[in-house]
Amino acid sequence: MDLAGLLKSQFLCHLVFCYVFIASGLIINTIQLFTLLLWPINKQLFRKINCRLSYCISSQLVMLLEWWSGTECTIFTDPRAYLKYGKENAIVVLNHKFEIDFLCGWSLSERFGLLGGSKVLAKKELAYVPIIGWMWYFTEMVFCSRKWEQDRKTVATSLQHLRDYPEKYFFLIHCEGTRFTEKKHEISMQVARAKGLPRLKHHLLPRTKGFAITVRSLRNVVSAVYDCTLNFRNNENPTLLGVLNGKKYHADLYVRRIPLEDIPEDDDECSAWLHKLYQEKDAFQEEYYRTGTFPETPMVPPRRPWTLVNWLFWASLVLYPFFQFLVSMIRSGSSLTLASFILVFFVASVGVRWMIGVTEIDKGSAYGNSGSKQKLND
């Protein structure tokens, strides 16, 4: 390991990233709270401000991926479709197999200048998580309870609110509903057999109702669906801890642009269309494992400097007073003060490990591990 790699793996560096993220995130959340005063006066101004405040938070995680770890992402796509990326609203359908696939989705949004306005379909519990969840709340993310009878109206209402959103955006959705594991895959394929659907080797059975209502609600606002199939070269198994340690990964992303008018308007036909899409995605993954590449022309969108500039700004803003406080604490020589600092250090280290742990596949959501009644209804 070279000197830079050794430095990046040090826990002290991880604590610095964690401190900057938490301190700046709470400051930004506070500013977002005050922007609520704008909502009844000028809703579009509220949205534009929060779009940029959101970028200040989410771009810090993208910075870790693109600048700290140096992860490279090659896009395989039709050159004619490539010219439209970033210039239109789109629904992005991404497979959900890797611990950092959400970061790769954000990186895709960032490369085309749409990170601040990008949306996700997320479970409603995340709305209560400080920093990320609160940021999502202020940027009108769509939250679901994963119970269709409850989500039918609430998700549709939230999506309708996005029809007059003033910024371009990617709406990222994992139609599988949960991250791929062997156990979830086995259960999912039992459902596929019960429904008479072809077996998928590399994906879970897609949840069609959420996709259908998204397409129906955003029709004539969103121009296309971007079918994105992600994999990593040389059987790399990327993790957030690896990114934090500065490990470089090599992502390949196959992107197909499908005009929204090509997707059926009828819900049942739309569901059948999505199942066919996932059968095609599965074939693309199988071909990737066989040949090491995707179809179409490989392209590397340029890495933009703004994620790094944003992090350096917030780091200089919050680290200077912290180090001043730390120096004054050490100079005081008080055993109680030093004990308090050690306690804070310990709590921070536990916090860092917890934040990393929630992204790990073996500690992921239990959704999809049980059974069948709900899946048969999807």
Curated annotation (Swiss-Prot):
One of its GO terms (molecular function) is 1-acylglycerol-3-phosphate O-acyltransferase activity. SMART domains: PlsC. The HXXXXD motif is essential for acyltransferase activity and may constitute the binding site for the phosphate moiety of the glycerol-3-phosphate. The lineage of its organism: Eukaryota, Metazoa, Chordata, Craniata, Vertebrata. It holds the Pfam family Acyltransferase. CDD domains: LPLAT_LCLAT1-like. Belongs to the 1-acyl-sn-glycerol-3-phosphate acyltransferase family. It is found in: Endoplasmic reticulum membrane. It catalyses: a 1-acyl-sn-glycero-3-phosphate + an acyl-CoA = a 1,2-diacyl-sn-glycero-3-phosphate + CoA; (4Z,7Z,10Z,13Z,16Z,19Z)-docosahexaenoyl-CoA + 1-hexadecanoyl-sn-glycero-3-phosphate = 1-hexadecanoyl-2-(4Z,7Z,10Z,13Z,16Z,19Z-docosahexaenoyl)-sn-glycero-3-phosphate + CoA; 1-octadecanoyl-sn-glycero-3-phosphate + (9Z,12Z)-octadecadienoyl-CoA = 1-octadecanoyl-2-(9Z,12Z-octadecadienoyl)-sn-glycero-3-phosphate + CoA; 1-octadecanoyl-sn-glycero-3-phosphate + (4Z,7Z,10Z,13Z,16Z,19Z)-docosahexaenoyl-CoA = 1-octadecanoyl-2-(4Z,7Z,10Z,13Z,16Z,19Z-docosahexaenoyl)-sn-glycero-3-phosphate + CoA. The keyword Membrane applies. Keywords: Acyltransferase, Endoplasmic reticulum, Lipid biosynthesis, Lipid metabolism, Membrane, Phospholipid biosynthesis, Phospholipid metabolism, Transferase, Transmembrane, Transmembrane helix. Pathway: Phospholipid metabolism; CDP-diacylglycerol biosynthesis; CDP-diacylglycerol from sn-glycerol 3-phosphate: step 2/3. This is 1-acyl-sn-glycerol-3-phosphate acyltransferase delta.
